Amino acid sequence: MGCSASKDTTNSKDGAASKGGKDGKTTADRKVAWERIRCAIPRDKDAESKSRRIELFKRFDTNGTGKLSFREVLDGCYSILKLDEFTTHLPDIVQRAFDKAKDLGNKVKGVGEEDLVEFLEFRLMLCYIYDIFELTVMFDTMDKDGSLLLELQEFKEALPKWKEWGVDITDATTVFNEIDTNGSGVVTFDEFSCWAVTKKLQVCGDPDGEGAAKTTADRKVAWERIRCAIPRDKDAESKSRRIELFKQFDTNGTGKLGFREVLDGCYSILKLDEFTTHLPDIVQRAFDKAKDLGNKVKGVGEEDLVEFLEFRLMLCYIYDIFELTVMFDTMDKDGSLLLELQEFKEALKKWKEWGVDITDATTVFNEIDTNGSGVVTFDEFSCWAVTKKLQVCGDPDGEENGANEGN
């Protein structure tokens, strides 16, 4: 897309119109294809979407390495998702999304040049693909002659559409010149997409912004149920419930729980997956913390099991991590599992509810961002949150000697 290209507006618009569009597709064809694509890309955070995403990743991963190259992603977008039904620019779209997800993954992991996307970045990449597709819809709506360059007149003719997209433009020429950053007199897709993202033109590749009220209400109901379901207290009734729960978890009858038994119990008995799609990660963190503390107390080295003495502590850790997840997800609007400074600032009112009055958000954000990557991971957030005691009271007695269940 050269910025110096010129347009023959006399003939090219008529030619595009006679074909029904720049790639031979009519508007109706493209709408049908777009609706199918919206359903085909599993971007949501619910359990069903995650299950579809796991299966899709396996199908994309033709080499079986657990990491996807650009070629594997592009082939999958053609042969499995069939995204080429919508656009002739699929390689460009996939390349943009692949690079953004890969670069962010490398930045967080501290890796330099790894040219692969792992499962942790896969959802983010799908969100980017969706975003770029949706921006393509907007751009194509205005780009009547299919030259991949917008002229001022085309921009002005699309003003009624801008209101639908969430922007009320009063001075089209000024805005057009703002978008045309290199002053060429035409707007490229790159220039348009950079500007559109800053204006948040209802481009919500991560659908958590859509219907967020319903999601929040559902999560509140689930969270209240989970608060009651995890018997963390030291009173007689809670201990009795804990003994019964341990027996239900202990399907092998050994008096010790492996990680698989704990995870299965959290799914089938406590039903903690109603609240989050990250249950395996949460349980793994809690299991490891309780197990390691138990081994330290007992003087055992590597036993990979949790006994009843550590069971209450493990439940407390699960509760802690769930509550931290609530906090993190409240701020992480785009679902990338990374917090940006702007997201952190937008949550300042919430911080007061969580027990911290922040006056200098940038300084605190940089304090949390211990590796200086410019984004905050959940690990960084949770480590900092625990030091601030953000009303995260997994162990309701404030004690970490929960390995002693004899109390």
Curated annotation (Swiss-Prot):
Gene Ontology terms: cellular component: motile cilium
Residues the entry annotates as binding Ca(2+) 4: D250, N252, T254, K256, E261
Signal peptide (from-to): none
Domain EF-hand: 48-83, 130-165, 167-202, 237-272, 319-354, 356-391
Region called Disordered, residue ranges: 1-27
Binding site for Ca(2+) 5: D332, D334, S336, E343
Binding site for Ca(2+) 2: D143, D145, S147, E154
Effect recorded for I80P: In strain: M110
Location of region: Ancestral calcium site 6: 299-310
Effect of E85G: In strain: M110
Keywords of the record: Calcium, Cell projection, Cilium, Flagellum, Metal-binding, Repeat
Function according to Swiss-Prot or TrEMBL: May contribute to the rapid motility of the trypanosomes, playing a role either in flagellar structure or in calcium metabolism. Could alternate between a GDP-bound inactive form to a calcium/GTP-bound active form.
Family listed: Belongs to the calflagin family.
Database matches in PANTHER family: CALCYPHOSIN (PTHR34524), CALCYPHOSINE LIKE (PTHR34524:SF6)
Domain notes: This protein has 8 EF-hand domains, 6 of which may be functional calcium-binding sites.
The protein's name in its UniProt record: Flagellar calcium-binding protein TB-44A
